[in-house]
Amino acid sequence: MIHHKYLNFSTAIFLLIGSFSWAQFIEVNAELDLRRISEGDRQIFITLAKDIENYFLNTQFSAITNDLEMIVDIRLVLESVSQGGSQTTINAQAIFVNKQVQPDGNLKTLDQYFYAKGIQFPYSQGRKMFYTTVFEPLVSFLNYYAFMFIATEMDTWEYMGGTSFFNRAIEISDLGKDSDWSTGWDDRWKKSRKVKSNQYLRSMRFNYFKAWDALYAEDVD
């Protein structure tokens, strides 16, 4: 099912993403809120926002969902920086929302909004991120929400099409709960299971977009 919500900017997408056409995300806008962080510590995060954007844009989270073309805004609120030996630990909150390009070129907020609290991860300036299925606090956190977005999007393309991706998010949160960085992961585990099990809402989303596509097809004809 090809939703008309993407058709208006498909040509621009092709020009923008080039060699990264296999990724699920075509635009990611990451913003850091550093107001609670001291001036001395802020320099640690010079590249973090761009690194997060590049991670989403350049990672193939699934080989079978290459044409989703999602746009996401991420706001990461850094709450504290603590030192323990040679390790720097970050505590944060985050908001993830999906967006859609309008005919006038502006971005409109869509239907997915995720608020994450209790984020904790080790970090060092300039640290690069690479996809892995092994639990890694920051990368696994980003993977979790990538799969949540993919799952909810796939539910609009195919009936219960996001189930396997909800399962991926649940698996990540299982690893997080059992790790040395378990803060917040129980909440994320509950969230992914709750959304996955809400078959009424998931079927409603699929039927809405199915009807929407049928209506658009009639308008085109």
Summary of predicted features, one role per range:
Residues S19-A23:
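Sec/Tat signal peptide C-region and signal peptidase I cleavage site
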Residues S86-S124:
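Signal peptide-directed extracytoplasmic domains
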Residues G161-D221:
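Flexible, glycine-rich surface segments
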Residues D111-G176:
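Internal, conserved structured core segments that host functional sites
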Residues I2-S10:
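Bacterial N-terminal signal peptides that target proteins for export
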Residues Q24-N91, Q102-D104:
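Start-of-domain marker
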